């Protein structure tokens, strides 16, 4: 939502056009938007965690793994949010991806159950879900329990982030829906 509003303000004020015609490489512009999205996401996450710690306490099994997966997840969702903002033509379109893509992926990503409880077919289908790898890496960082090898989880989240980054860079270079 915030990214979408920023995009509309940038188009209205012609800021994005100024960026696109500037001598700054597109990948640096993209990194700026991604860093902004990550900072906002991490800020909200830290505030929610601090608020939760007021009511309860929890241990962390591996602080480096937890920090790494939180950063990688915020990176991936920042890029995905930027792509969603580029494709959304109005405020209502912003909710299409979270409603029809993100929610089912979350429910099928092992958030509420172990994927070992699934049948072979659905377990194999779940292996194509990037949220499964984020959830399992985060679960390992907090509790030390995982269904998937932690290296494999980090590799898949990293691969998904690279693919999304390259797609966002392609959209930025093409100027898709950015130049009016």
Name the predicted role of every residue range:
Residues 20-25:
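Short helix-to-coil transition segments within interhelical loops
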Residues 26-98, 146-169:
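Alpha-helical transmembrane segments and their short interhelical loops
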Residues 16-19, 51, 55, 84, ...:
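Hydrophobic alpha-helical interface/terminus motif in multipass membrane transporters
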Residues 106-163:
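Membrane-interfacial helix-loop-helix junctions in multi-pass membrane proteins
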Residues 172-180:
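Short cytosolic juxtamembrane segments of multi-pass membrane proteins
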Residues 1-11:
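Single conserved hydrophobic/aromatic residue that forms the stacking wall/gate
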Residues 71, 87, 97-108, 122, ...:
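Hydrophobic transmembrane alpha-helices
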